[in-house]
Amino acid sequence: MPKVKSGAIGRRRGRQEQRRELKSAGGLMFNTGIGQHILKNPLIINSIIDKAALRPTDVVLEVGPGTGNMTVKLLEKAKKVVACELDPRLVAELRKRVQGTPVASKLQVLVGDVLKTDLPFFDTCVANLPYQISSPFVFKLLLHRPFFRCAILMFQRELALRLVAKPGDKLYCRLSINTQLLARVDHLMKVGKNNFRPPPKVESSVVRIEPKNPPPPINFQEWDGLVRITFVRKNKTLSAAFKSSAVQQLLEKNYRIHCSVHNIIIPEDFSIADKIQQILTSTGFSDKRARSMDIDDFIRLLHGFNAEGIHFS
């Protein structure tokens, strides 16, 4: 009897699992290339909704509702749910699922890319995000006005850990400090890959984000310009990070614009490199590294540069 190759067995099992997935999803083929992994565990869905502490008067923004496993439970607790979904097939499934139910009138569906969509007013955001858009969506949320109360978001585990990382942590990065400048961030729970259909290749985590209201009195473009420079090589000293010719050209251009606007005469022997080093030394950050600096450190450094007419945007 001929042997059956293990590869053929694996492919057959894969097709069988795929057929089971299609059957359980009403015949839909999920597109994992755009992050379609449907959260199927009702215990985790209930836990996420509990963490949101919804009020009967709340408008909830749900991003990536999929086939509506979480949506139907949100509709039971909130005044209104605005669901943003990219895939028209899933939109049809979602509408079919709530059609004719007492909560159908509470659902509004936005069809399209949430990053390109003008967000409506909402009190709370609950989302099982496609991982490809996680980072830009966080900042779209945090720069949204009027302020929302909180967001309960599912992320790829590593990205979630970056959001909550502290100075000195291996994963501490530009995303960490920018998010924590604008919001309080808490890691709520881990979610294993088998809680999704189809399972993703990585583990997930749920994070709670609460925007700071009022926000810190800082120009975010200025702030991010500084943070971007220092975190390109977060293990370098700031003195080394600012020796980049591209960085010095940008800052000199901005400095000359500042001086022109304020009628400040620039000496003929002016050196932007010397000016930068003077500021780093006077603020005490010349030998510091971005990986170990907290929000207060960066605020002091930004104020030090701005006070000398050097800007980052």
Swiss-Prot record:
Specifically dimethylates two adjacent adenosines in the loop of a conserved hairpin near the 3'-end of 18S rRNA in the 40S particle. Involved in the pre-rRNA processing steps leading to small-subunit rRNA production independently of its RNA-modifying catalytic activity. Part of the small subunit (SSU) processome, first precursor of the small eukaryotic ribosomal subunit. It catalyses: adenosine(1779)/adenosine(1780) in 18S rRNA + 4 S-adenosyl-L-methionine = N(6)-dimethyladenosine(1779)/N(6)-dimethyladenosine(1780) in 18S rRNA + 4 S-adenosyl-L-homocysteine + 4 H(+). S-adenosyl-L-methionine binds at residues 37, 39, 64, 85, 113, 128. It is found in: Nucleus, Nucleoplasm; Nucleus, Nucleolus. InterPro entries: KsgA/Erm (IPR001737), rRNA_Ade_Mease_Trfase_CS (IPR020596), rRNA_Ade_methylase_Trfase_N (IPR020598), rRNA_adenine_dimethylase (IPR011530), SAM-dependent_MTases_sf (IPR029063). The gene is DIMT1. SMART domains: rADc. It comes from Macaca fascicularis (Crab-eating macaque). The keyword 4Fe-4S does not apply. It comes from the Eukaryota. This is Dimethyladenosine transferase. One of its GO terms (biological process) is positive regulation of rRNA processing. The lineage of its organism: Eukaryota, Metazoa, Chordata, Craniata, Vertebrata.
